[in-house]
């Protein structure tokens, strides 16, 4: 009774938190926008200092470049035509990279903004909007979280778990978005010093790499925005689609699984695209497949754990009803037993995983939790010890 009362109290507190803090979750998305604005303002404050240092470096290298060319022509005893041709070539070289130095940061930001708009489909996109998309999906799924005697409690438990997975995954995607935006501001700012290396023919490749880097960051942002928008649209479509009662449980688990897949794709694919643009291999395909398999295993384990908890709760409710309890009391007791058994199994699995118990090393936490839930439902708490040897 103590465990059931504790589980019931935790359940009521959790539902109250979800109900009354939805607006607070939505407001937290604005913090990401404020963070982006602060980083942008701080980066602009350093732009003049770094650009002045890049200009000084550029003209020092340009002077050395012209001096070396003049000494080389003098040693070769070149004619007046050779002097004039070399002078024109050096002036064109220095003039072009001087233009890149002054207009390069503006051009780089224009390229990134253009690719960003392409990824956003001509609309707007920000970390706060991605976070709010996850909140909208979770809010739509909350309509399925209806507990009661005549309600589908298994579907309600799955909906609550899926809501948490969706909010966490989209929060992480928004965090990735913020990190890419910070990389863009800081990378383009610090990379401006590379434009100063365009004053010499020996170091001009560094200035070109700055423009390539800007294009790579733009492609990374475009891919990330496209993934986030497509993923949110698919999840909203699944959450809003009218389905039969027999399919709602599968759809709920599918939403949780797809949100994990969106997070994994948002973590790896934009970096791979940036690496292709810059000519570097960032990640292998097998690494992405491995993490995708881990995400799928996590989603499947969570689904089986929710189903096992629902079965345990149903059995406890039937027992309470047979003992003479009312329908409401039996439903609450069954639901409390389901939540309590799932929480106890997950906590015990996490403890064994943390302390490295025998047999827990090769399995995951959710796998161990499902095994413990099956054992408790079967009426035994662990594996039977082997018989003692009698020598």
UniProtKB/Swiss-Prot annotation:
Keyword rRNA-binding attributed: no
Stretches that traverse the bilayer: 12-32, 57-77, 92-112, 115-135, 157-177, 178-198, 211-231, 253-273, 295-315, 322-342
Keywords: Cell membrane, Conjugation, Membrane, Plasmid, Transmembrane, Transmembrane helix
GO annotation, cellular component aspect: plasma membrane
Protein location: Cell membrane
Residue segments, region Disordered: 372-391
Signal peptide interval: none
Disulphide bonds in the chain: none
Membrane-topology descriptor: Multi-pass membrane protein
Gene Ontology terms: biological process: protein secretion by the type IV secretion system
Similarity section: Belongs to the TrbL/VirB6 family.
Protein name from the UniProt record: Probable conjugal transfer protein TrbL
Encoding gene, per UniProt annotation: trbL
